[in-house]
Structures are given as C-alpha cells and as structure tokens.
UniProtKB/Swiss-Prot annotation:
Protein's name in the database: Sialidase 85-1.2
Catalysed reactions, as listed in the record: Hydrolysis of alpha-(2->3)-, alpha-(2->6)-, alpha-(2->8)- glycosidic linkages of terminal sialic acid residues in oligosaccharides, glycoproteins, glycolipids, colominic acid and synthetic substrates
Further comment: The parasite mammalian stage surface antigen exhibits extensive antigenic diversity.
Keywords: Glycosidase, Hydrolase, Repeat
C-alpha cells in the first residue's frame, strides 16, 4: 500500500501490466517521458520508463541497471498507439501495439520489486541522471522536472492524449493486449483458442487507484508535457 497525492493506492501483486492508448499529436523539441512505473520504495529508485523522441523513435530505460535502449520502430503522429509496461518477477518489458519493444530487461535487485506508483509525463521522483553514464547527463536534463518549464508553455495544446488506461495484476500475453486494443473479447479472436476469457483489471481497487493516481499526476505536472484533466474513460466498464 502507498499513500501519496492525498490518495491511498492499493496494489495486490508484484506482477503487473499497465496498458494505455496514447496519441502523440506532434513531435516534441526534445526527448520526452511518456509513461513511467516506479518499482519499490528505494533510494535510488528503480523505475521503468517509455519516452518518445523528436525524431519519432521510442526509447526505454530501466533505472538501476543503466539500460538505455532506443528502438528504430517509429511512432506516428496523430495515430493511436497502445503502450504497455509489464513486470514479471524482476523482468521488465515494454510493448507497443502488442509487440515487444526490445528484449526483457532483468533488474539486478535482490528483493522482489512491486509497483509503487505510475505517472504520465515528467515525474517528481526523477533524479539527477536517467540511468545512463556521465555522457547522458545532457539527456537527463531534458527530462527535467515540470517546475523548470517556462510559463509560456503552460496552457498550450498538449502533445499527447491518453485514453483507455487499465491496470492488471498479472502479465498479459500479446493476444490479450491485441484484444484490449481492438476492444473485442479474447474468446472471439482466432486462431488462438487457448485464451478462453477476456482479461480483467484488478477489481475493484486497482482501476480506481490508477484513476486517482493519473489525475494527481496530470494536475501536479501541469508545466510538463500534459495539461488539464486526463481523458480517462469509465475504468469500471470491464469489471463485470
């Protein structure tokens, strides 16, 4: 359990999958964090992050192992992409549109990791480096805290729209993630009949917790990449 942003967050499992639909309206002027999961209450913090770059590339980083990977697979402006962060044991992975983005990143930590918090855009638990070596210090400054954003940027049209955010208390397979993206029951999708039911979010606490956490991060980081109320739909629609 974690209490923060005046909201009590409850997590039921060390394994998780966080899935969201994102639309990047235009290229940023610099590398920009999109989605981050904080893994455990430790110093320095462990986290897994997905960022998007000015040259339309995806970038992933697993803090704690100094693993920084930039993928050649591009993101497309104004196109809806499904992004997912997944933790299975101590292996972190990122999926884009149901396909793995690079290899799983094993995190060399003795104790099991668990989700401690999530955020969209810049995060207040960012530290002085982004998990790389000294040559990456300039890049880490690009992921600066929102308080360093100029007043002129506040209130401008957001670069990213985030919808359909779901938190699951287990890893999902590619078939299940495609079913979420296509918004159809998994059981109707061929030719993979081994999946009998559609995946369900953590019920009922986790979807509510994710909704509150997302609201808190959007409001707190108004000077960052995302502004205003997050366009999150009714997250209880799949509880039935």
């Amino acid at each position: 359990e974690h209490s923060g942003d005046n909201v009590r967050h409850v997590f039921l499992n060390h394994n998780f999958t966080l899935v969201a639909s994102v639309t990047i309206e235009e290229a940023p002027s610099e590398k920009t964090p999109l989605l981050t999961a904080l893994l455990g209450d430790a110093e320095p913090p462990y986290f897994m992050r997905l960022s998007y770059t000015a040259d339309n590339k995806w970038e992933t980083i697993s803090k704690g192992d100094k693993k920084l990977t930039t993928e050649s697979r591009p993101w497309v402006p104004k196109k809806e992409h499904q992004v997912a962060l997944m933790l299975q044991g101590n292996k972190a992975s990122v999926y884009i549109d149901g396909e793995s983005l690079g290899e799983e990143a094993p995190l060399t930590v003795e104790t099991p990791l668990e989700p401690f918090g999530f955020c969209f855009g810049a995060c207040d638990f960012d530290d002085d480096d982004d998990g790389g070596d000294d040559d990456d210090e300039e890049d880490s400054q690009e992921e600066s805290s929102p308080k360093e954003s100029s007043p002129e940027k506040i209130g401008k049209k957001p670069h990213v729209t985030v919808t359909n955010v779901f938190l699951y208390n287990r890893p999902l397979n590619p078939t299940e993630m495609r079913a979420i993206k296509d918004r159809i029951p998994v059981s109707t999708r061929a030719p993979e009949p081994q999946v009998k039911i559609a995946p369900k979010p953590v019920a009922p606490a986790a979807p509510g917790s994710l909704r509150c956490l997302a609201h808190g991060k959007y409001q707190q980081h108004r000077g960052g990449q995302l502004w205003g109320e997050p366009p999150i739909p009714n997250m209880r629609q799949r509880d039935a």
